[in-house]
């Protein structure tokens, strides 16, 4: 991870180098904290005697907080302009509330601890992303490279923690507390903005900004902002793909620990599987902006949902080799969705709405989709067993993907009859290649001219 930090910071000027390293370690700190908490939670709940339905309810507390509480933190962050201070306070509160899990192992005690913890922890990701993405733009650091630090940190923690928790499972929440304090330190070390910038321009890193301009947000001229945050109604389909994909990914992630224990394996295997999935993200991060430019955001999102079906089927087989193969698909089931959606949201959000834009994405992905995954997954798991539940979830994801693809094509057809042709990436589901690149160049030229006139 240190070598990656140096690579991120290799820019002219000491301030830029220091800023790149600070952004890198802030991302590492968050994903290390998430890696110590999320993957092992269902295993811990199983070890203290919770049923699948009870686990589903407990795991739903975090999505509920994402839906109802996290947007309030994002709005406070944007309204005050003090994103770093808000994120620091949330990190400190997360560290303190993690220790509430030691109050008892009854269902009520665990439920209370979970509710209090997620009130703060659920807001860390969108606020951290907003700060890091804006910092990457301000200091000309590639966001994909910074995000690789988070992947490495997550993989390192889940592997080490998985082995450690085999011997001392009760230590999980002490580790979460310590890593939340590390997150606090990394936030305090984040650089300030070097100058006032347009919030939309500050949303992307230099490389991501060049390629994500192919993401459509100008297909509907003179249309009121969607949710008062986004420039185009196309955001509905971006969020729909994120929902469908996360519905499968959320089920798999939430109940993988229980499934592994049910199959007779230990927490060590949970750590190994989580590390494998995290490390598989690295190749995608190296080429993510090129993939978006080549195939388009919608193509990648549709492809990711199809691969999510394959991942669920492989894990559902219950064999270690197939489970490892399924986890290797993390790169094309999570990271492609995360990168496409995060960059799209960052570019299409109106000025001053960056935190709220990322908040909407997290609300749909980590909130609504996770609630469906956890509640339905817990009920199906108790009724049919975890193996069959994986297969049933794969079928639901496949149907959802088909519905969103058809709806998007219908919407595009309507737009094409009333507006100028959409930019290249919006054609992702029906074509790519030279024609797409030509359309992208034309739309990019038009967009640059419009922005120049606006200035």
Regions found by a protein language model. Give the residues of each.
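Helix-to-loop junctions at the C-terminal end of transmembrane segments
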Residues: 68-82, 164-166, 283-296, 381-382
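Helix-loop boundary and gating motifs at the non-cytosolic
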Residues: 13-63, 234-273
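Juxtamembrane intracellular "pre-TM" segments in multi-pass secondary transporters
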Residues: 2-17, 191-241, 433
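Cytoplasmic helix-loop-helix junction between adjacent transmembrane helices
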Residues: 114-149
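Symmetry-related core transmembrane helices of the 12-TM Major Facilitator Superfamily/SLC fold
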Residues: 172-189, 389-407
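Structural signature of the two symmetry-related core transmembrane helices
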Residues: 85-99, 299-314
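Conserved MFS/SLC helix-loop-helix module at the cytosolic interface between two early adjacent transmembrane helices
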Residues: 68-105
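Helix-loop junctions at membrane interfaces in 12-TM secondary transporters
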Residues: 20, 101-114, 314-327
């Amino acid at each position: 991870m240190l070598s990656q930090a140096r690579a991120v910071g290799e820019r002219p000027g000491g301030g830029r180098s220091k800023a790149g390293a600070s952004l890198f370690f802030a991302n590492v700190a968050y994903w290390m904290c998430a890696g110590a908490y999320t993957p092992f939670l269902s295993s811990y709940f199983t070890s203290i005697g919770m049923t699948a339905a009870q686990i589903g309810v407990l795991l739903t507390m975090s999505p509920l907080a994402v839906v109802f509480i996290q947007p309030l933190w994002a709005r406070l962050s944007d309204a005050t302009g003090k994103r770093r201070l808000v994120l620091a306070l949330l990190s400190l509160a997360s560290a303190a509330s993690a220790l509430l899990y030691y109050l008892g192992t009854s269902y009520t005690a665990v439920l209370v601890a979970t509710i209090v913890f997620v009130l703060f922890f659920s807001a860390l990701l969108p606020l951290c992303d907003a700060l890091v993405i804006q910092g990457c733009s301000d200091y000309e650091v590639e966001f994909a490279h910074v995000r690789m630090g988070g992947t490495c940190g997550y993989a390192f923690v889940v592997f080490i923690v998985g082995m450690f928790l085999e011997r001392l499972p009760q230590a999980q929440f002490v580790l979460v507390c310590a890593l939340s304090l590390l997150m606090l330190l990394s936030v305090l070390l984040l650089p300030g903005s070097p100058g006032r910038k347009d919030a939309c321009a500050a949303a992307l890193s230099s490389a991501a900004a060049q390629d994500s301009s192919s993401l459509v947000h100008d297909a509907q001229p003179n249309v009121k902002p969607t949710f008062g945050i986004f420039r185009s109604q196309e955001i509905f389909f971006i969020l729909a793909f994120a929902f469908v994909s996360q519905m499968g990914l959320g089920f798999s992630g939430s109940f993988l620990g229980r499934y592994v224990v049910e199959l007779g394996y230990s927490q060590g295997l949970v750590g190994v599987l989580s590390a494998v999935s995290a490390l598989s993200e690295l190749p995608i991060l190296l080429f993510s902006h090129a993939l978006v430019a080549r195939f388009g955001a919608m193509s990648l999102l549709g492809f990711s949902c199809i691969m999510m079906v394959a991942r669920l089927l492989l894990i559902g087989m219950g064999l270690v080799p197939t489970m490892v193969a399924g986890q290797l698909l993390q790169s094309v089931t999570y990271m492609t969705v995360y990168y496409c959606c995060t960059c799209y949201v960052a570019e299409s959000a109106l000025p001053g709405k960056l935190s709220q834009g990322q908040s909407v994405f997290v609300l749909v992905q980590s909130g609504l989709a996770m609630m469906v995954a956890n509640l339905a997954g817990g009920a199906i798991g108790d009724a049919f067993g975890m193996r069959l539940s994986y297969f049933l979830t794969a079928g639901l994801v496949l149907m959802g993907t088909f519905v969103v693809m058809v709806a998007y094509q219908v919407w595009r057809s309507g737009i094409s009859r009333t507006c100028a042709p959409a930019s290249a990436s919006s054609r992702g589901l029906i074509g790519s290649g030279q024609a797409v690149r030509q359309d992208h160049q034309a739309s990019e030229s038009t967009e640059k001219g419009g922005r120049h006139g606006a200035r």
